[in-house]
Amino acid sequence: MYEEPLLLLRQEVQEPGIYSAIIEAIAGGATRSNEISTKIDEEPAKCLKYIKILCELGILYKEVPFGEKQTSRKTIYGISDFMFRFWYRYVFTNRSLIETGAQDAILKKRIQPTYSDYMGLVFEKICSDYLMLQNIRGNLPILFTKIGRWWGSDSASHSQAEIDIVANEGKDYLICECKWRNEKLDLSVLKGLKEKADAFMKKRNNTWYVLFSKSGFTDAVTNEAQNDDHIILVDLHDIINLK
């Protein structure tokens, strides 16, 4: 397991060093092709060629904001293989320390402080899979035909906004927020999600707000959902017990 990602990479490509550097850059937070090429000090065109190969191998994925063309200038890249993602985030960068036996210190100082952030994207994937299964079973308010993430500018707040999951059937939408944290999800998250939904698209027929939370919801959120059937709450228990 310790060397497996590198061994797999060496089996698939002829220049594992540059491919490994690209994956490491993405694991470290560089997601746009120009950011990645700058991080690894490689020509943008050459770097993009290597990125496309990693996408073809299923190690990376290409993503554009929901509703935009595949040629969008907002394209980002991520690590689709979760073993590669964890290994390059926490193992590869700490190899010298691991080899000195400092595993406990690495866990305390390098992994635990950032693990909730790391799990955020993993939880989004779990929530997306949950929605797709419920969609197949006809258990959602809409039968969506498309699902993805959205990010872009919020003209009202003059800032960048991101929606974890968007799914639609025509002009009817599911707008979703996924929270992997130890605190219960509160009303401020719901309010923020509604604001981001307007930044994404103001002209919608019907919108259901789906809140996913690792640690449940405050009473205020629960009461809000009981009085509004366009608010759907899903906690970790619901996901784990889905059959």
Q: Which ranges hold each PLM region?
A:
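Interdomain hinge/linker elements that couple catalytic modules in large macromolecular machines
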Residues: 1-84, 88
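A cross-kingdom feature that marks ATP-driven nucleic-acid transaction machinery
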Residues: 75-243
